[in-house]
Amino acid sequence: SCNCVCGVCCSCSP
């Protein structure tokens, strides 16, 4: 599994 990392496992808004 992978933790929520912006651009890796999920998308994050700036």
Swiss-Prot record:
GO cellular component: extracellular region
Compartment annotation: Secreted
Cross-link (5-methylthiazole-4-carboxylic acid (Asn-Cys)): N3-C4
Modified residues (Cysteine methyl ester): C12
UniProt crosslink position (Thiazole-4-carboxylic acid (Ser-Cys)): S1-C2, S11-C12
Post-translational modifications: Maturation of thiazole and oxazole containing antibiotics involves the enzymatic condensation of a Cys, Ser or Thr with the alpha-carbonyl of the preceding amino acid to form a thioether or ether bond, then dehydration to form a double bond with the alpha-amino nitrogen. Thiazoline or oxazoline rings are dehydrogenated to form thiazole or oxazole rings. Maturation of pyridinyl containing antibiotics involves the cross-linking of a Ser and a Cys-Ser pair usually separated by 7 or 8 residues along the peptide chain. The Ser residues are dehydrated to didehydroalanines, then bonded between their beta carbons. The alpha carbonyl of the Cys condenses with the alpha carbon of the first Ser to form a pyridinyl ring. The ring may be multiply dehydrogenated to form a pyridine ring with loss of the amino nitrogen of the first Ser.
Annotated positions of the Cyclo[(prolylserin)-O-yl] cysteinate modification: C12
Record keywords: Amidation, Antibiotic, Antimicrobial, Bacteriocin, DNA replication inhibitor, Methylation, Secreted, Thioether bond
One of the protein's GO biological processes: defense response to bacterium
Function description: Has bacteriocidal activity against Gram-positive bacteria including multi-drug resistant strains such as S.aureus MS9610 and methicillin-resistant S.aureus, but is not active against most Gram-negative bacteria and fungi.
Family that this chain belongs to: Belongs to the thiocillin family.
Protein name as catalogued: Amythiamicin A/B
